[in-house]
Amino acid sequence: FVGATGAGKSSILNLIGRYFDIQKGEILIDGVNIKDIDTDVLRAAIGQVQQDVFIFTGDIKSNISLDNENISIEDVKRAAEIVHADSFIEKMPGGYDAPVTERGSTLSAGQRQLLSFARTLAYDPTILVLDEATANIDTETEALITSALAKLMEGRTTIMVAHRLST
């Protein structure tokens, strides 16, 4: 979806995740009305990368895996490699065990966004939602993400939200 601020792009995403009830019409996923899908099941299928990234106190590894025991260190490293976050992670003292402060204050905006992409990819959702995911990052990081998008979207329903068609 592309549109100006206030056009309803984020509202559509909230409808897809069933955070709001649909008043008219229906939204189908693989031909199934989302009202017929258990809310927890639906939301578990959606991986979202937003404009504003939340980074947790801990380490790089836990910020990608969110300490989910089903996500191995190999999954974390594979996800980081696909989104090109591995290049900065491996340069950090401690690599994937490098400490991260609250909100990732020691990381650049681009590095935080790459971690968010890696986090979503490690989770392996069937539906990928990119909500202004490249809006506040530098052109170099945007180029890294753009080069990884084909792999990120492979085998997934992907919904992209942007203010400009170029993003």
How should each PLM-predicted stretch be described?
Residues F1-T167:
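ABC-type nucleotide-binding domain
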